[in-house]
């Protein structure tokens, strides 16, 4: 009896491995949410528009590969807000001068509600957010309360104009885990990529007739 139980256990373990291997292959065969977001942006947001993009995509995401746009200084399709530099230190204090270079893992520590005021004032009307960044903040809100307040301000002052989910219909979102955001092991995933949301701010220069 014991050998039979061992054999059954081995079959079940192998079967589980096959299920997850097939699932992962199927997920990776589908369009990535970041590509879906870019396709929507290319169809709906004119070239040279000022946009804010969280560091959830490569820098080339804002460019048409092999076709540099002549209307921007670096050839990118859109003008990106400089999220890689900030005047906010990791402890929330304000730095003088040109600020500092922001490591990707520290991005959420640079967010605060006043950024939304700046976006509206300067015409950065589209904000592209991804769960591989926002999820960091929501997993440890006590460490980055200003980031949580930033997302609340963004949601209250902007419309969601595009959303792409990596989850299958009816599935509960996976609790934030940085590794699972890239290997898609949980069966809730239907396609690769983070949850992507594009916001359009409503006020300031982003209001109708505001000039942005």
Regions found by a protein language model. Give the residues of each.
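C-terminal luminal/periplasmic domains and tails of membrane-associated envelope-modifying transferases
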Residues: 16, 26, 33-212
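Signature aromatic-anchored transmembrane alpha helix within multi-pass, membrane-resident enzymes
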Residues: 1-21
